[in-house]
Amino acid sequence: MTENAQAAQPVFSIEKLYVKDLSLEVPNAPKIFLDRENPQINVQLRTEASNVDEGVFEVTLTVTVSSKLPEDRTVFLVEVAQAGIFQIRNIPEGDLEAVMMIGCPNILFPYARESVSDAITRAGFQPVVLAPVNFESLYQAQQQQQAAAAAQAGELPIQ
């Protein structure tokens, strides 16, 4: 293979994985530990990407897990921002966003899930094990919502 052909090959590598931010709140402790009601668990996910250098991107998956009892009493609130630095080169421009919003979160999610479960357990609660997430379907749904919003605003979607 020539040098030019090697240089044009797609590159995807993990440079670093790390916890960017971790917070845990138990605002109603210690009384909340005496409550025997079953709480409602709510999980929210958010993915953000930024260009760090040429062909190097930071992708951050933020997982927020809240647990509430009736009457809107918070049991706990955990937020983990699991980040990674990825080298992504020679990927077609149209595919770059999908790689960062599907491929990278798939790599980050198991680490975020472990951090969430560990924080909740260390706070004195039963662990919450997050179910696997289909980031591809989330990305496609987001793209459809953006296209619908653009159509309502009278704009043409960018392809």
From Swiss-Prot:
GO-annotated molecular function: unfolded protein binding
TM stretches of this protein: none
Family membership: Belongs to the SecB family.
Record's protein name: Protein-export protein SecB
Species in which this protein is naturally found: Aromatoleum aromaticum (strain DSM 19018 / LMG 30748 / EbN1) (Azoarcus sp. (strain EbN1))
Subunit-level organization: Homotetramer, a dimer of dimers. One homotetramer interacts with 1 SecA dimer.
Functional summary from the UniProt entry: One of the proteins required for the normal export of preproteins out of the cell cytoplasm. It is a molecular chaperone that binds to a subset of precursor proteins, maintaining them in a translocation-competent state. It also specifically binds to its receptor SecA.
Keyword entries, A-Z: Chaperone, Cytoplasm, Protein transport, Translocation, Transport
Major location (coarse): cytoplasm
This protein's GO CC annotations: cytoplasm
This protein's encoding gene: secB
Biological process annotations from GO: protein folding; protein tetramerization; protein transport
Database matches in Gene3D superfamilies: SecB-like
Subcellular location: Cytoplasm
UniProt KW Electron transport keyword: no
